C-alpha cells in the first residue's frame, strides 16, 4: 500500500507513548529496521541515525534534509505494528497463555503483548529466529538493560535503593509506587502458577534455568511495553497497548509532533500507516522528536510524575508546561438518610462527578493552581451532608458553592487533616533538598529530591488554600 498517494492525516489521542533514552545504539541494526520499513511502504528516507541533542539520551533519528511544517517526517505501515491481535494469534501464546480460563488467568491487551514479547525474546521454541519482527526485536534494549523505572528497577543497586528511600518519603509518589509494586508482585505470582509453569513443563529439558529466565524476561518485557507502547493509537486497532517500530526510537520533547494516522483519500476511516508530523519548519540534521500527549487536548497533558512512572524520566527539558501533581485519594462514605428521596438525590449528585458510595475517589492537586479543584470540594460536601444540605444542593442543581457553615467546616477539616499528615511524612525541608541538589547528586537521587520538593510545595499550597477558603466561607452571610 503506497503511502505517497495519501494526504488525509488524523491526529490521535496519545496516552501512553514511547521513549528510548538507552536503546540499542548499533547503527546497522537501526538501518536494517529502516530498510524493512521502506520495503513495506513506510516513509523513512527523511531520517538517519544520529546523536541526540538531549543530554544523556544517546542515539537519535535526525533529518537528512529540511522539511516544512506539516510534513510527514517518518511513517510506519500498519502491518509492522505489534498489537493485541498479533499476540493472541501466536501459537505459543494460544497453547501456554490463552488456554487458561479467564477466571484462572485474565489476560488484558497489555499483558498479552507483554507475554508475546517475552516469548519472542527468549525464543524458547526456536521460531523467533524466523520472526517477522526479528529486525525490530534486535533494535530493543538488551535483556540486562536497566530501565529507570522505580517500581521495577531501583532496588537493584545500592545507589538506586538510597534514591528510592527518598522517593518513598514523598507521600503521593509512595502511594503510587506501593500500588504499582503490589500489582506487579501479584501478576508475577499468578504467572508463575500458570504460564511459567506450563512453559517450564514443556521446555525445561531443552532450556536450562528456564523459570529464572522467564522471570527476568517478563520484567524486561513489561518495562519495554510500559516505556514504549501506545494506548489506543486508533479506534480500528484493538487493545490498550500497541508497539510501533521505529517511532519508539524517537526521543521525547513537549514541542515534538504527536502520533498521527495516515488514511486513504477515498476511505478516511481506513488507516494504513502511522507517523510523526513536523510541528514547525525543520532543518538538516535536526532531531525528530515525538510528543507524548494529544497536541489538541491540553486538559489531558500528563503530570511530570506520570511521565516518570510511565517512561522513567522527568520531562524538564525546554519550555515544558507540564504541571507537578499530587494524587489525593479518599473513600466515598456517606450516611444513609431516613428519606429515600434524600438518598437518591445524594447518589445522583455524586454521579454527576463520576463518584459513588464505596469508590476510592482520586483527584490530582496541581502545583500553581489558585484554589482547590471543584470536584474535590463538591464530592466532599455531598459526602458530609445532612438531609438539609442535600435538599439545598438539589434545589440549586449542584453543590458547587458551600451548603452550610457546618458542612464547609467538615469538608475543609477533612482535607486539612489529610494534607497535614502528608506534609509531616516528608522528613526534610525544601531548602535542605535544594541545597543537596545544588551540591550535586546522581541522576536517580536528583529525580527523587525534585519530586519531594514539589510534593512538599503542593502540600503547603493546599493548606494555604484551605485557610483562604475558610475565611471566605466565614464571610458568606447566607451560610449558617
Could you say what each language-model-derived stretch is?
Residues 22-80, 84-89, 104, 120-480:
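Long, positively charged leader/targeting segments at protein N-termini
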Residues 108-111, 298:
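Secreted/periplasmic proteins
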Residues 113-116:
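Short amphipathic beta-strand segments in non-cytosolic proteins
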Residues 4-21:
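Cleavable N-terminal signal peptides of Sec/SRP-targeted secreted and luminal proteins
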Residues 92-102:
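Intrinsically disordered, low-complexity polar regions and short flexible loop motifs
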